[in-house]
Regions:
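Bacterial N-terminal signal peptides
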Residues: 22-33
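C-terminal cap/linker of serine protease catalytic domains
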Residues: 42-50, 209, 213-258
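A short, Trp-centered hydrophobic/proline-enriched beta-strand micro-motif
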Residues: 50-71
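Conserved active-site neighborhood of the chymotrypsin/trypsin-like protease fold
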Residues: 63-64, 79, 86-167, 241, ...
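Gly/Ser-enriched beta-turn/beta-hairpin loop segments
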Residues: 67-76, 123-130, 177-191, 223-227, ...
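Catalytic nucleophile loop of clan PA
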Residues: 83, 197-217
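Short beta->alpha transition motifs characteristic of CBS
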Residues: 97-103, 175-176, 199, 215-222, ...
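Flexible, gly/ser-rich surface segments that form the specificity/activation loops bordering the active-site cleft
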Residues: 143-148, 152-188, 198, 220-228, ...
C-alpha cells in the first residue's frame, strides 16, 4: 500500500481523458502481469531442453541387494542419477553423482538420455560432502553451470531418476539457501526447494530457469516413508566447486582430455 499521507490525492476530481488513460493502464498492467507469470511458470520445457541430455541414470550394483529398481537387473541397488560435468569442455566422460549412491557399489552402469548404456567407475569421492565423480567411455554434453546465489522464490527444476523409472522433471522454487546442520552430511551447504524429489533422484540436477546447474540433488525430509514432502535439498554449486578444487589439489581429480 502507498503511504497514507498522500492518499488525499485520490479524492481529487479526475477528467475523462485521464480516467480513460488510467483504465487502459490498468488493463495493460494486468495483461503484462499475466504474461510475466506465464513466462515464469512455463520455463520447464526450455529448462528440460537445455539440460536433460546432460543428466544420466546411475544403476549401482550393491552386494547382497535383492530388490532391484524398475527395469534394473537383479542385485542392483535402488537407482540414482548423475550429471555430465566439465569445467572447459562441451563433451565429457566425467559424471557427478551423490557418493551415497555408489559408495558400496561393486559395479556401476549409467544410461544416457538416448538409452545407451555403459560401465562407469568411481574416479574420486568426497564422503564428507557426499559427492562422487565417475568416469565412463560413454561421453555426453557437460551441463552448463549457473549461479547458486538465486533469490528466494526463484524458479528451479529437478531432473533425476525418481523411483528408478527413468529421468523426469519437476519444478518449484528456491525455498531457502545456505541450509546447514541438516544432518545428511558432515559438510553441508544446501539449496532447499519444493520441487518434487524422490528416491532415485540423488545425484541429479537442480537447474535454474535457463537449464543451468545450480545444485546436485541430495536428500529429502520425510517422516514415515520415502514420500516427497516439499522440503528437499540439493548440494550448492559453490560446495561442489570447493569439493572438486580439493580433489584436484590432492591429486585425485581429474585431468580433462583436451
Amino acid at each position: 500500500m502507498l503511504e497514507t499521507r498522500n492518499s488525499r490525492w485520490c479524492s481529487a476530481p479526475v477528467t475523462r481523458p485521464i480516467a480513460r488513460l488510467a483504465a487502459w493502464l490498468t488493463i495493460w498492467l494486468a495483461i503484462t502481469g499475466i504474461f510475466a507469470a506465464v513466462t515464469h511458470a512455463n520455463h520447464g520445457p526450455a529448462s528440460w531442453a537445455a539440460s536433460h541430455q546432460s543428466v544420466v541414470v546411475v544403476n549401482p550394483t550393491w552386494p547382497g541387494y535383492s530388490s532391484p529398481g524398475h527395469g534394473a537387473p537383479a542385485g542392483t541397488a535402488p537407482a540414482g542419477s548423475g550429471v555430465y560435468y566439465a569445467d572447459h569442455q562441451a563433451e565429457t566422460g566425467y559424471v557427478l553423482t551423490a557418493a551415497h549412491v555408489v559408495r558400496r557399489a561393486t559395479h556401476i552402469e549409467i544410461v544416457n538420455a538416448a538409452g545407451a548404456r555403459a560401465t562407469a567407475v568411481i574416479h574420486a569421492v568426497d564422503d564428507r560432502r557426499d559427492i562422487a565423480v565417475l568416469v565412463t567411455n560413454l561421453t555426453g554434453p557437460a551441463i552448463q553451470l549457473g549461479n547458486d546465489n538465486l533469490p528466494i522464490g526463484s524458479h528451479v527444476c529437478a531432473i533425476g531418476n525418481s523411483f528408478g523409472l527413468g529421468n523426469s522433471i519437476s519444478c518449484g522454487v528456491v525455498s531457502a539457501r545456505n541450509r546447514q546442520n541438516i544432518g545428511f552430511n558432515d559438510i553441508e551447504d544446501f539449496i532447499q526447494t519444493d520441487a518434487a524429489i524422490n528416491p532415485g533422484g540423488s545425484g541429479g540436477a537442480l537447474i535454474d530457469s535457463d537449464g543451468r546447474l545450480v545444485g546436485l540433488i541430495n536428500g529429502i525430509f520425510t517422516k514415515d516413508a520415502d514420500i516427497d514432502a516439499g522440503v528437499n535439498f540439493a548440494i550448492s554449486l559453490s560446495l561442489i566447486a570447493d569439493s572438486l578444487a580439493q580433489m584436484r589439489e590432492s591429486g585425485v581429480l581429474f585431468t580433462e582430455t583436451k
